Amino acid sequence: MEHILSRNIDLSDYNDAGFENQQDFKEHINRIGNFTLLYNTDNSSIGNKMFKDKIEMYKSSDFKITNVIAEPLTTEVKSGMDTKLFNLINDLEKTYTPNENGHFSKLLIEQRSEEVANALYKILTKEYD
């Protein structure tokens, strides 16, 4: 699992990422919206870089959920049982832009957490049928 906003940022970066203090940061860092998938080797090599510096790695990831964070992505299924499910996922997953300081910010963590939770709810309850 990859933390989009690194869990090891400098104290001076808390405000730049939209956090009031260290406690505010700790309350957000492990939310579902701050996680994505990367292979262990990619995760290790990306280290504690800022979000703006991770985007190219995300674009080249084998994981579509990680690609879409960095660039728009569509997966079209024209017919079949999974058409509505794929359309739901495409509609709910968004591309994100670093804040003015290059971070995946507190606001983006909150937004993406809500979006991921909504998508999971709709998938698990089959609300897309």
Regions found by a protein language model. Give the residues of each.
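Flexible coil/loop and intrinsically disordered segments
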Residues: 1-129
